[in-house]
């Protein structure tokens, strides 16, 4: 058995009817091309996808749920992002 470890890639597939990619799984591959081909073979067997993204797991940076308060607090001071000062015209029932 080899001691060589291939990097881990996260796989995102966009369905034919979808507008966004969704995470479908992970796989190990020697390079990006192999990751794309393996992702195609493993995650789009029934031709349900129209686009695949593969991203090295080591390159993904994410916020942590336990830091959400301090991370998202700066958005509270940007009142222009909240539609509270718009008036809704008469006759509009659902917005």
From Swiss-Prot:
InterPro entries: PaaB (IPR009359), PaaB_sf (IPR038693). GO terms for biological process: phenylacetate catabolic process. Pfam families: PaaB. Pathway: Aromatic compound metabolism; phenylacetate degradation. Induction: Activated by cAMP receptor protein (CRP), integration host factor (IHF) and by phenylacetyl-coenzyme A (PA-CoA) that prevents PaaX from binding its target sequences. Inhibited by PaaX. GO terms for cellular component: cytosol; phenylacetyl-CoA 1,2-epoxidase complex. Gene3D superfamilies: Phenylacetic acid degradation B. Disulfide bonds: none annotated. It comes from the Bacteria. NCBIfam families: PA_CoA_Oxy2 (TIGR02157). Homotrimer. Forms a stable heterodimer with PaaC. Probably forms an oligomer with PaaAC. Component of 1,2-phenylacetyl-CoA epoxidase multicomponent enzyme system which catalyzes the reduction of phenylacetyl-CoA (PA-CoA) to form 1,2-epoxyphenylacetyl-CoA. The subunit B may play a regulatory role or be directly involved in electron transport. This is 1,2-phenylacetyl-CoA epoxidase, subunit B. It comes from Escherichia coli (strain K12). The gene is paaB.
């Amino acid at each position: 058995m080899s001691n060589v470890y291939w990097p881990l890639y996260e796989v995102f597939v966009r369905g034919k009817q979808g507008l966004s990619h969704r995470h479908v799984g992970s796989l190990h591959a020697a390079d990006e091309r192999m990751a794309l081909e393996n992702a195609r073979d493993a995650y789009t067997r029934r031709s349900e996808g129209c686009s695949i993204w593969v991203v090295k797991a080591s390159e993904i940076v994410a916020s942590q749920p336990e830091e959400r308060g301090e991370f998202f607090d700066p958005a509270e001071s940007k009142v222009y992002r909240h539609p509270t000062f718009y008036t809704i015209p008469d006759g509009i029932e659902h917005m």
